């Protein structure tokens, strides 16, 4: 059995404690943490396992909770489409799922499920200008998809390039 088979089987059965369970919690916690979420690892786990929030004497950002729940759905979609070539359409669909229902979705200038409209930077580093994003993403995807089998280094290189382009206003992590 491949890792993908195990992930698909555990996803279908909602098996607790396996690689699917751990992947959902670890990827969601770490990705959201990089994007500034203040949810703890334990809160992320609790949301995944129970679809509820149990908090006393603590203020939570609603967007953190929404994006956490949405991130679980993004991972499920990636497992479902794992054998499909990575595309702009899929990347935009993931962004749409991630940001739906957040306060960003109510901003006129924020393009949920589409590339950024305004320039942005990451850690003081300039990113691709909005008018450059589409072309740079197409080039990145063409280079990545041209590889017959992807190594771990190929995946890391793709992610570094993706982060340098930073195609979305927010939610690029």
Feature-to-residue mapping (PLM):
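FIC/Doc superfamily catalytic core
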Residues: 1-172
């Amino acid at each position: 059995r491949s890792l993908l088979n195990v992930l698909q089987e555990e996803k279908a059965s909602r098996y607790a404690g396996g690689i699917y369970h751990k992947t959902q919690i670890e990827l969601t916690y770490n990705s959201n943490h990089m994007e500034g979420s203040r949810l703890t690892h334990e809160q992320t786990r609790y949301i995944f396992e129970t679809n509820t929030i149990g908090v006393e004497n603590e203020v939570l950002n609603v967007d953190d909770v929404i994006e956490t729940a949405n991130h679980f759905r993004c991972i499920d979609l990636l497992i479902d489409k794992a054998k499909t070539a990575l595309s702009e359409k899929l990347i935009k669909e993931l962004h749409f799922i991630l940001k739906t229902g957040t306060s960003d979705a109510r901003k006129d200038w924020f393009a949920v499920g589409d590339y950024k409209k305004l320039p942005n930077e990451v850690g003081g580093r300039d990113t691709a200008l909005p008018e450059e994003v589409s072309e740079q993403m197409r080039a990145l995807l063409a280079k990545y998809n041209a590889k017959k089998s992807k190594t771990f280094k190929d995946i890391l290189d793709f992610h570094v390039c993706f982060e340098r382009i930073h195609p979305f206003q927010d939610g690029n992590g």
